[in-house]
């Protein structure tokens, strides 16, 4: 049973978002996603300044098992990337909801948040997949 923090919003494609204030949202992949992928070896992050639309593939997580696209859960501009992942991609495995965040987006359309799931909805979607 994966850990699903209640303060986050989730995409069905297993990304999470956390409001950091001032329209800035941190984005990462869920504990469930990192469990499926296995040990991370490289994370290809978007460049700061990249404008993404909700649903766009914007990063790649490479693990010992596979390379998997990561999708933008909300639209906006990438304003920061987690540079610690360059030398320590395993943070995505060990701390997917904290130190293993991927990038931050300045949201351009708040209504994108309405399309995301709360923790209960995401947990239910995981149980349907089992």
From Swiss-Prot:
Transmembrane segments: none annotated. The keyword rRNA-binding does not apply. SUPFAM superfamilies: Single hybrid motif. Keywords: Lipoyl. The modification N6-lipoyllysine is found at residue 65. It comes from the Bacteria. The keyword Zinc does not apply. Signal peptide: none annotated. HAMAP family: GcvH (MF_00272). This is Glycine cleavage system H protein. It comes from Pectobacterium atrosepticum (strain SCRI 1043 / ATCC BAA-672) (Erwinia carotovora subsp. atroseptica). The lineage of its organism: Bacteria, Pseudomonadati, Pseudomonadota, Gammaproteobacteria, Enterobacterales.
């Amino acid at each position: 049973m994966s850990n699903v923090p209640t303060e986050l919003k989730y995409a069905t494609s297993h990304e999470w978002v956390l409001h950091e204030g001032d329209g800035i949202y941190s984005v990462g992949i869920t504990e469930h996603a990192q469990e499926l992928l296995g040990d991370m070896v490289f994370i290809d992050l978007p460049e700061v300044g990249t404008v993404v639309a909700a649903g766009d593939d914007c990063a790649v997580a490479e693990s010992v098992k596979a390379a998997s696209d990561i999708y933008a859960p909300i639209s906006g501009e990438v304003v920061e990337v987690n540079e610690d992942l360059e030398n320590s991609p395993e943070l995505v495995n060990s701390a997917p909801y904290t130190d293993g965040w991927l990038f931050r987006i300045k949201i351009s359309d708040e209504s994108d948040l309405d399309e995301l799931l709360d923790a209960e909805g995401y947990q239910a979607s995981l149980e349907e997949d089992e």
